[in-house]
Amino acid sequence: MSGYRVISADSHIVEPPDLYENRIEPKFRDRAPRIERHRTRTGREYDAWYFEGVRVGTVGSVIQAGKRFEDPGSIDFLGLWEDVRKAAYEPHAMLEELEMDGVWGACLQPSQGLFWYRLSNSELLSALCRAYNGWIADFCQAAPDRLKGVGMLNVDDVDEGCQELERCADLGLAGVFIPVYPLPDRPYRHAMYDRLWWTAQDLAMPLLLHVATTRGGIPGCEFTLDFNQLTAAGLANSDYWIRYSLTAMIFAGVFDRFPRLLVGSVEHETAWVPHWLKQMDFTYRERPTLRSWKSRDGMLPSEYWRRNMFVEFMEDDYGIRLRDIIGVDNMLWGNDFPHAESTWPKSREFLDRIFAGTPDEDRRKITSDNARKLFRFSKESE
């Protein structure tokens, strides 16, 4: 791996307890989520985020980096703010822990913010996004060549979402989240999103669809504000939502109309992609009655994938074996620091294992070059 610097396309911060109270507009301050300390029935203390009296996530659910290598049985998603690694909220400490992992730079995404997409109050969700976007922009200013922030958009109101997207670009953010699945009555095939697609294309801002960011109220979706509703089946099949949304965009002709738009899957891993591409191409060719769109350029759905989409993953060795079908240029690796699934601090070992026998050029693209180009890291990262 000599000769280039590894970049994590998917790392996270952990939002400080006072982020929203300090950053949100005054009219929303009384309703801002807060961290409260409670005890379990056995007397163990833990911190959790609360919104209007309802628990909407524990601090411990996003701070378990490294435990899988020490004692995976101890991962119970309980914890105190004092347990959070300083690197998760302080940029210089972040750089130190990335270096410990053999990583030079990182694209930083929210942690608790993933849960906010499930809020029913759209106006408040937008305010939380604005508060976070300002904070993460300031965080990355400590090392703008090595830390790239990803903002959050609420796209319930497309015009409002486009305004915030423009602000994110002005703040220097490298991309933005949109819900992996929007409100149930307005999937991404709707023309109402065309201004969003145009704005993202015009600003060269990638749109990222992260696991567990479905909007609230979607029938059959177990990612709700009540974490107890999530079952093993719901988690293991979470890639359904990303497949549906990306397929809806392709078959609505979004990438015909916006050929430079870039949209990506985050943390759904990647081995599902080949079968999905095959199914889309089959449907396009063999089931024309199920589609109302015909490619302007005679392209198959799989060809739009290769031109307009990307996938971020952590340790999908099956995906590496299938890289020629998925597309080496479409794959980006991330260490998911500081979450329980993170490969930190053993990312180098994981990369050596999953890339065993893989050409060095492919490994470099997936672990460095693709992220550098997509998120505009400095030439120093080459």
Regions found by a protein language model. Give the residues of each.
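Short, well-structured secondary-structure segments
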Residues: 79-86, 103-120, 124, 144-152
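Charged helix-capping and loop-helix junction motifs
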Residues: 125, 129-132, 189-195
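Catalytic pocket-lining loop regions of alpha/beta-barrel enzymes
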Residues: 140-148, 153, 157-159, 163-332
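Short glycine/proline-rich turn/loop motifs
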Residues: 69-85, 114-119, 228-235
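Mid-to-C-terminal alpha-helical segments outside catalytic/metal-binding sites
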Residues: 2-5, 16-85, 89-105, 134-142, ...
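Short acidic-aromatic active-site loops that bind/stabilize oxyanions
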Residues: 83-87, 125-126, 236-244
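Conserved residues at the C-terminal ends of beta-strands
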Residues: 15, 109, 179
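Active-site metal-binding loops of divalent metal-dependent hydrolases
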Residues: 11-12, 336-337
